[in-house]
Regions:
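Conserved beta-strand hairpin/beta-sheet module of binuclear metal-dependent hydrolase folds
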Residues: 3-55, 150-164
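Active-site HxH/HxHxD metal-binding segment of metal-dependent hydrolases
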Residues: 42-130, 159, 217-227
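Active-site loop signature of alpha/beta-hydrolase-fold enzymes
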Residues: 23, 70, 96, 169, ...
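Short secondary-structure boundary segments
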Residues: 39, 66, 92-93, 165-166, ...
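A structural micro-motif
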Residues: 11, 57, 85-87, 134, ...
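Metallo-beta-lactamase
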Residues: 34, 42, 104-105, 111, ...
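Residue-level detector of beta-strand structural context in well-folded domains
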Residues: 24-26, 121, 126-127, 149
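Short Gly/Pro-enriched turn/cap motifs at secondary-structure boundaries
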Residues: 16-18, 118-120, 140-142
C-alpha cells in the first residue's frame, strides 16, 4: 500500500491511562472535532474526562485499534454517555472477535466488560477517517489480533501513528492469545517500519511513546520484519 504523506492540518493529543492493566486511551483533536481511540475501561468516566479535556468539541468517532477487551471495554459506556449518533469503528476482522475477547478477559483475569454495540463502520486497509482538518489512514497490522490496525496521520504538526498493541518499545505485542501470530506481527512491524516516516511519533496501547526511527535502530523484531517486507 501507499500512504498520503502530504502533511496538513493540526492534531493535538490527550492520553488517559486507565484500567487495571493501564491501557492508553487517546483523544485526538483537530479543529472543532475529536476522535476517541481505544476507550478501554469505564466508558462513562472516560466521557467525563473527555468533556473536561476537550470542552466544546464534537465527537466524530470512536475507533478501536483491535478487538481485545482492554481496548473495547469502554465503548458501550461512552456511547451511552455521548449518544448513539457517535459512530463506532473497528476493523472488519476484529469485529468478529469482540465477544470472545471479552470472555477470555473474564476467564483469565476476572475482569468483566460490556460488549460494544455493533460497529457503524468496518475498517480495512487503505480506508481513511477524516475529521477536523486531518485524516487517519488505516494500515492493516495483523499478528496481535487478526484485524489489528495502525492509524497514521500526516499532520502539519507532525506525523503520528496510533499503533495499539502491535508495537512496543524494542518489542511487539503478545501473540499467544486467540488469533495471534508471531510471523504476522513481525511482518507487520516490518511493514510500518517501511511505510511510516522515521519521525513518526508512535502512540502505544500500554507504555510510553516511541518513534519509527528509534525502533528501526533498536527493535530487532522490526528489523527482521523489514527484511521480509522488502
Amino acid at each position: 500500500m501507499t500512504l498520503d504523506m502530504n502533511r496538513k492540518g493540526s492534531l493535538a493529543i490527550h492520553c488517559v491511562t486507565n484500567g487495571p492493566i493501564q491501557t492508553n486511551t487517546y483523544f485526538a483533536v483537530s479543529d472543532d472535532e475529536v476522535v476517541v481511540i481505544d476507550p478501554a475501561w469505564e466508558g462513562e468516566r472516560l466521557a467525563e474526562v473527555l468533556a473536561d479535556r476537550c470542552p466544546g468539541k464534537r465527537v466524530a468517532a470512536i475507533i478501536c485499534t483491535h478487538g481485545h477487551a482492554d481496548h473495547i471495554g469502554g465503548v458501550a459506556g461512552m456511547r451511552r454517555a455521548l449518544g448513539s449518533d457517535v459512530p463506532f469503528l473497528i476493523s472488519e476482522a476484529d469485529s468478529e472477535i469482540m465477544g470472545r475477547a471479552i470472555e477470555d478477559m473474564r476467564e483469565m483475569w476476572g475482569f468483566d466488560h460490556e460488549l460494544p454495540p455493533a460497529p457503524d463502520r468496518l475498517l480495512n486497509e487503505g480506508d481513511v477517517v477524516a475529521f477536523g482538518d486531518v485524516e487517519l489512514q488505516v494500515v492493516a497490522t495483523p499478528g496481535h489480533t487478526p484485524g489489528g490496525i495502525v492509524l497514521f496521520c500526516a499532520a502539519a504538526t507532525g506525523n503520528v501513528a496510533f499503533v495499539g498493541d502491535t508495537l512496543f518499545p524494542g518489542a511487539h505485542g503478545r501473540t499467544d492469545l486467540e488469533g495471534g501470530s508471531e510471523k504476522q506481527i513481525i511482518d507487520s512491524l516490518g511493514k510500518i517500519g517501511a511505510l511510516l516516516p522515521a519521525d513518526t511519533l508512535c502512540l502505544i496501547g500500554h507504555n510510553d511513546t516511541t518513534t519509527i526511527e528509534r525502533e528501526l535502530e533498536s527493535n530487532l523484531f522490526m528489523r527482521r520484519g523489514l527484511r521480509h517486507y522488502r
